[in-house]
């Protein structure tokens, strides 16, 4: 897209002929559609400016444009006119990232959040035992727990949207070192405007080309944001695994959709396939962030010289997270079954439910109730009802404990 819109601007400004501009745009658009993919053998691990890839692109476009035009098209003089690898490659990386974030990851996160909100609403009165340090705490509702997950996903989307304007500042027009040598005045802003119209994204020319080309802070920020999204999804996936553990020897409070046989030796075993997939994706995204962080240390004087691996790492994270969030939504969250009775029993058996009684009967008396329930082999709920120390039926009391401010 960068080459196509640069050709249009070069044609408009008289740098190349109108017919050549049309031919270059047609060739570039064919590549965007996936044609001639076999003409790009250059590996991502190359010179740090991305010059190898930029020249590969220039040469393929020039060759195809010459076929279309019926006259020679030069890869440097015509296709790369008003450009340098040093501004074109990082611009292409940013355009690709912004477009993929807007068209794949953000919509997927929105869908996941909607499914979590729906699950939360359906279980706003389903009482369960909260746990801190993996130990019983006080009652809450499953709806409250899932609502926390939904808010985390919502915040992930907000973080992405907040950093998009910085990622959408394009170095194009800065040419070799940011001075704009050999590029006509206004070239960068004109290309950014055309890219905005083409992608419906708000691209702008970098406010300072020296910053945009000598460092890649916006790309690193995007990678770090992907890490936060990954860690958020990892937390949800970890909770799903734990809540669905067992079912007989674990918590077993939810039943995750069964996607495949869980063992080649243990018949009937079902594993939390999707949550474990999400957690592995999170591990990879954290690794990609570490790669981008190290790559940022290769910003020296007027150029960052690790652009290819930076771009690859960010695009990998976006792709992985979009797929992981989509599968988590469609293959897990929407199919979760909740064992309400097991949640209720676990809550009633927990010593933590006397917490609400402590202000009325005193800490020591509440502690004594816990010990008596253990000695008699009954649940605290049963003992509380026997002693008539609760102000309401235990089910109502447990639900009331989840909303103490009401």
Where are each of the predicted segments found?
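Conserved, well-structured ligand/cofactor-binding cores
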Residues: 1-406
């Amino acid at each position: 897209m960068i080459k196509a819109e640069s050709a249009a601007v070069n044609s408009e400004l008289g740098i190349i002929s109108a017919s050549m501009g049309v031919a270059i745009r047609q060739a570039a658009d064919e590549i965007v559609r996936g044609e001639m993919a076999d003409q790009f053998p250059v590996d991502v691990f190359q010179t740090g400016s991305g010059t190898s890839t930029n020249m590969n692109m220039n040469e393929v476009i020039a060759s195809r444009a010459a076929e279309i035009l019926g006259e020679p098209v030069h890869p440097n003089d015509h296709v790369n006119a008003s450009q340098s690898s040093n501004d074109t490659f990082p611009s292409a990386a940013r355009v690709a990232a912004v477009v993929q974030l807007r068209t794949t990851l953000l919509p997927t996160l929105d869908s996941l959040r909607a499914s979590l909100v729906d699950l939360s609403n359906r279980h706003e009165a389903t009482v369960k035992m909260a746990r801190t340090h993996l130990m019983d705490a006080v009652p809450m509702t499953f709806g409250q727990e899932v609502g926390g997950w939904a808010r985390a996903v919502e915040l992930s989307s907000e973080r992405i949207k907040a950093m998009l304007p910085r990622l959408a500042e394009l170095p194009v027009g800065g040419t070799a070192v940011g001075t704009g040598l050999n590029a006509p005045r206004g070239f960068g802003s004109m290309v950014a405007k055309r890219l905005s119209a083409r992608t419906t994204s708000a691209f702008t020319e970098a406010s300072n080309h020296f910053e945009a080309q000598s460092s890649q802070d916006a790309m690193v920020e995007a990678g770090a944001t992907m890490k936060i999204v990954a860690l958020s999804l990892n937390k949800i996936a970890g909770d799903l695994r734990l809540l669905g553990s067992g079912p007989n020897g674990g918590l077993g409070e939810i039943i995750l959709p069964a996607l495949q046989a869980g063992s080649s030796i243990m018949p009937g075993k079902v594993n939390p396939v999707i949550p474990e997939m999400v957690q592995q994706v999170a591990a990879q995204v954290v690794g990609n962030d570490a790669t981008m962080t190290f790559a940022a240390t290769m910003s020296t004087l007027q150029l960052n010289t690790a652009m290819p691996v930076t771009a690859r790492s960010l695009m990998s994270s976006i792709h992985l997270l979009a797929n992981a969030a989509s599968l988590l939504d469609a293959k897990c969250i929407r199919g979760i079954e909740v064992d309400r009775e097991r949640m209720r029993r676990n809550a009633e058996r927990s010593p933590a439910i006397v917490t609400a009684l402590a202000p009325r009967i005193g800490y020591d008396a509440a502690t004594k109730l816990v010990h008596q329930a253990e000695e008699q082999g009954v649940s605290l709920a049963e003992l509380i009802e026997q002693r008539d120390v609760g102000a309401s039926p235990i089910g109502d009391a447990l639900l009331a404990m989840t909303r103490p401010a009401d």
